[in-house]
């Protein structure tokens, strides 16, 4: 399998990361969770008291970050940040930092460099429309806000994070609004992407559907 790239986009909590991860394993290609990269920038910015409006400090911060992946975990400057970037404070702030044009430009450049070197499956908000515009396989994964909130709540409870369903639903809806209405690279379905609503399907069913489309070619 040479020069394959798979773009998976969709809103928060649609299941795209889980789906992309399994597809990466099944097809033996590199999985890049671009959302983890924005979360890592958010974590480091908050730790360093850098506001989303402080563009120069954000650019300096990102240029100082050596980002890689170990399996499914994101490594920044040699440290595994996977657990830290899943905390509610990151959920509540990531869309603000991800909306900054200069942040997106720097991370998109990193993502495109990776895709030129490896066969990849990437998930995010702007993969099919910006990062991998020429990807032969594009999918837009979605589900109702309520279904996505239930899934996210289950994930958080498994991590012993106590939060109400209403708070998770509110956060999902707020992120949807910010992601879809930001000026730079908003969340939207690429015209040539296949739409899959996962509300009434299991993860396995969605993975099988996507893999059958890829293998068909």
UniProtKB/Swiss-Prot annotation:
Chain residues that bind ATP: 10-18
Catalytic activity entry: CMP + ATP = CDP + ADP; dCMP + ATP = dCDP + ADP
Keywords carried by this UniProt record: ATP-binding, Cytoplasm, Kinase, Nucleotide-binding, Transferase
GO terms under cellular component: cytosol
CDD domains in UniProt: CMPK (cd02020)
Listed InterPro entries: Cytidylate_kin, Cytidylate_kinase_dom, P-loop_NTPase
Enzyme class: transferase
Pfam families: Cytidylate_kin
Known EC number: 2.7.4.25
One annotated GO biological process: pyrimidine nucleotide metabolic process
Major subcellular location class: cytoplasm
Subcellular location: Cytoplasm
Molecular function in Gene Ontology: ATP binding; CMP kinase activity; dCMP kinase activity
Family: Belongs to the cytidylate kinase family. Type 1 subfamily.
Official protein name in the record: Cytidylate kinase
Species this protein is from: Clostridium botulinum (strain Loch Maree / Type A3)
């Amino acid at each position: 399998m040479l020069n394959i790239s798979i773009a998976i986009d969709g809103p928060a909590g649609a299941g795209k990361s889980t789906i992309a991860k399994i597809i990466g394993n099944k097809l033996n290609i590199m999985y890049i969770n671009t959302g983890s990269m924005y979360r890592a920038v958010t974590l480091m910015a908050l730790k360093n008291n850098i506001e989303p409006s402080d563009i120069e400090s954000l650019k300096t911060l990102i240029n100082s970050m050596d980002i890689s992946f170990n399996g499914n975990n994101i490594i920044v400057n040699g440290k595994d940040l996977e657990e830290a970037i899943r905390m509610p404070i990151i959920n509540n702030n990531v869309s603000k930092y991800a909306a900054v044009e200069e942040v997106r430009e720097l991370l998109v450049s990193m993502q495109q460099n990776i895709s030129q070197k490896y066969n990849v499956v990437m998930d995010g908000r702007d993969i099919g429309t910006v990062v991998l515009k020429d990807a032969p396989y594009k999918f837009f994964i979605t589900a109702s806000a309520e279904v996505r909130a239930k899934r996210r709540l289950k994930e958080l409870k498994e991590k012993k994070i106590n939060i109400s369903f209403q708070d998770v639903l509110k956060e999902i809806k707020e992120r949807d609004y910010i992601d879809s209405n930001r000026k730079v690279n908003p969340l939207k379905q690429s015209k040539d992407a296949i739409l899959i609503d996962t509300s009434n399907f299991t993860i396995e069913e969605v993975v099988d559907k996507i893999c059958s489309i890829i293998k068909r070619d």
